[in-house]
Amino acid sequence: MATYEQVKDVPNHPDVYLIDVRRKEELQQTGFIPASINIPLDELDKALNLDGSAFKNKYGRSKPEKQSPIIFTCRSGNRVLEAEKIAKSQGYSNVVIYKGSWNEWAQKEGL
């Protein structure tokens, strides 16, 4: 499980993927954690099956390798559990969740 401090440090670790699985409308309402990429939960399974160039075109970042460090975040820490299952079922082995997710981030950042 990732902590607030680890998530805050993600911009200093370009090899880490911070994936926000909330819907785009939610991000427009609340904002997002810096360095995160948005892949809504209902797109995640398909997204992780895209080839590398299609993934980069759609999400603006190279596709994670199976061993790449991935941290999932959402609003309250529930959807990340499903995201973790999806990624692990596709062979991603270095996956953790940020249980505090947006709610904790916003509180600690004073947003």
Curated annotation (Swiss-Prot):
Superkingdom, natural source: Eukaryota
Rhodanese domain boundaries: 12-110
Keyword tRNA-binding: no
Entry's transmembrane regions: none
UniProt keyword terms in alphabetical order: Stress response
Gene3D superfamilies, sorted: Rhodanese-like domain (3.40.250.10)
Electron transport recorded as keyword: no
Protein name: Rhodanese domain-containing protein CG4456
Organism whose genome encodes this protein: Drosophila melanogaster
